[in-house]
Amino acid sequence: ASVQADPAPESAPEAAASSVPQTVQALTGSIEDYLVPLLGEDARPADAGSILEKNYPQGSGEKYIPCGAGSIKNNTRQTAADIAAEIANPLPFAIDPNSPDPQVLVMHSTDRSINMCAVGRVVADTLNAAGINTLHDETLNDYPSYTGSYANSRAVVQQYLAQYPSIKVVLDVHRDAIESESGSRYAPVCTVEGRQTAQVMIICGCDNGTTVQLPNWRQNLRFAAAWERSMEGMYPGFTRPVLFSYRFYNQDLTTGSLLIEIGGHGNNLNE
């Protein structure tokens, strides 16, 4: 048996941090420097212990709503019919390709390990190469502790939105933490173009009317569904079902705010 350690539900954001970074903190050197860990390109995290590779399939049953070749796991009181109708609607924004103004912000509320910063940097570099003006923030939001990390990252995102009102999408890039009851780590994996690859899971929050205030959750859900349809359609097995739940994660700040779990704490960086 295994236990998936989902992040704890977030309540209303805490007070903003007293000191907000004024500039993007860039990694030094070439991205290739970060794609080969010191222990070797296929090395697992040094503290990983026993690793169990596992492919997480798309779901079926009353809790799952089909989304193209993918699916959405509904952990809310919203009906399946309501969700299915909502994700059929168009996106509430349009990305302006080749715009001189930033369209996307990639950031990390927690887990600013060198691996996840490298992953976020590849995401940003790939979008920029495709003509989508993207910024990457590497602020250490969970230092000195996890407590307050989302308040800190909220202040950072608000600063970017004030400086660059053209930003339509905010991607909070993380890795998941999945462990068995015995403490072994699971590595969510699939095969893409012949290479073992970390699976991806999108988390989209929902307003619960009290502690989780997300008036724009429907628009964010449409965006999550568009990602799921595209990714799973292009690369079958690449995604885990979208997790639609009462989570906050500062997703009230735009209509394109999502948390992206890229692999887990058992995956290696190449995956």
Regions found by a protein language model. Give the residues of each.
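Non-catalytic propeptide/linker segments at domain boundaries
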Residues: 3-105
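A short, glycine/acidic-enriched catalytic loop
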Residues: 178-213
